[in-house]
From Swiss-Prot:
This is Propane 2-monooxygenase, hydroxylase component small subunit. Its EC number is 1.14.13.227. The keyword Amino-acid biosynthesis does not apply. Keywords: Monooxygenase, NAD, Oxidoreductase. It is an enzyme of class 1 (oxidoreductase). Induction: By acetone. Transcriptionally activated by MimR. The gene is mimC. It catalyses: propane + NADH + O2 + H(+) = propan-2-ol + NAD(+) + H2O; acetone + NADH + O2 + H(+) = hydroxyacetone + NAD(+) + H2O; butan-2-one + NADH + O2 + H(+) = 1-hydroxy-2-butanone + NAD(+) + H2O; phenol + NADH + O2 + H(+) = hydroquinone + NAD(+) + H2O.
Length: 368
């Protein structure tokens, strides 16, 4: 009887390190527990910088072989020629508000709770029963009409260009701007529905006809529609946040509604409109920084100033025409706390101060 065969020993290939594994390469800060590909604005990077800077790389930063994605018959990635404005370093822009995905939901949720609580308290206290019919007519016609302007800017201006900028920091700021406008338009719509349910004296559907047919609103509607036809994302941002919002938006919201509502026994509308004004103040903050960066650019600053002057020549006359067409609205309320002349003067003064802050000359059209 033959002896049983011994089991064969299994062999394993010898492990060889090729220095291709993670952590093999040694370089400055390679042993650090944290490493950043960018230089933060301050001593340490903020959460905003960690989640926005270099999230959208380009051939100027890290993509040494060019864009790795793009349409088959078009340019790759995010071309810089999507605007005629120039910058020696688009990545230098950082949103002073430090807005990113989390702050969009957190800040908007806080505003939504504020508006809901305001409307709920108004209905419980039956506030609308004490409002004069003239003031209800003013709200249904003009505040309702402004809702269409906000909605148009949200959907067809800011949403349309939120992926057109050359850096993630610019695109994130514009996306937050779109969220602000969209939420404010929805707040005005909710306010309109609440009033329509609370009192029979309020017509909740007339705002559409006012926006489409009322002569005082047609120049404003025309400007909003002309804005949606602009293909240059930087011009669209400039014309909207720097020109239109100053000469028309703030004129209506801040210099009219916020001034006269309380005198007409209304403390609800200023609360809601005030959220839109607060949003615009934040949006203006990033817009001011962006255009100041472009006008002070060491290589393209003078060319950008000339370009922005051309844009002012296009949009200032249109927005002034829209502003002056709104003049009859100032005589509508029962208690006329302010005049159109004083409101327009205040809006022009703020606009002039803004232009000085971004190193631009005051256009001649502003004094005509």
């Amino acid at each position: 009887m033959s002896a049983p065969e011994k089991p064969r020993e299994r062999s394993f290939p010898k492990i060889e390190f090729t220095d291709s594994e993670a952590g093999a390469k040694v370089f400055p800060s390679s042993k650090s527990r944290s490493f950043s590909y960018f230089t933060p604005a301050k001593l340490r990077a903020t959460m905003y910088e960690d989640v926005t800077v270099d999230v959208q790389p380009d051939p100027d930063r890290h993509l040494t072989q060019g864009w790795i994605y793009g349409f088959g018959n078009g340019p790759g990635g995010y071309p810089k020629d999507w605007t005629t404005a120039k910058s020696s370093n688009w990545h230098a822009f950082l949103d002073p508000n430090e807005e990113w995905n989390q702050t969009i939901y957190r800040n908007n949720a806080a505003v939504v709770r504020q508006v809901e609580l305001c409307l709920k308290n108004a209905k419980r206290a039956r506030v609308y029963d004490g409002w004069h019919t003239i003031w209800l007519t003013f709200i249904e016609r003009h505040v309702g009409a402004w809702m269409h302007a906000e909605n148009g800017l949200a959907l067809h201006v800011f949403t349309s260009i939120q992926r057109s900028g050359p850096t993630n920091m610019i695109n994130t700021a514009v996306a937050v701007n779109a969220a602000h406008k969209m939420r404010f338009a929805q707040d005005l719509a909710l306010f309109n529905l609440d009033l329509a349910e609370a009192t029979d004296a309020f017509d909740g559907s007339v705002h559409r006809a006012v926006w489409q047919e009322a002569p005082e609103w047609q120049p404003t509607r025309r400007v909003v529609e002309e804005l949606t036809a602009v293909g240059d994302w930087c011009q669209l941002l400039f014309a909207t946040n720097i020109v239109f919002e100053q000469l028309v938006g703030s004129l209506f919201r801040s210099e009219l509604i916020m001034q006269i509502a309380a005198r007409n026994g209304d403390y609800i509308t200023p609360t809601i409109v005030g959220t839109g004004e607060h949003d615009y103040d934040r949006d203006l903050n990033y817009s001011r920084n962006l255009f100041r960066l472009l006008t002070r650019d060491p290589e393209h600053g003078e060319a950008n100033k000339a370009l922005f002057a051309e844009w002012l020549g296009i949009w200032v006359p249109r927005c002034l025409d829209a502003a002056r067409a709104l003049q009859p609205i100032w005589s509508t309320p029962a208690d006329k706390a302010v005049t159109f002349a004083s409101s327009l003067k205040a809006a022009k003064a703020k606009f002039s101060a803004l232009l000085e802050e971004i190193d631009l000359d005051i256009p001649e059209e502003l004094d005509k």
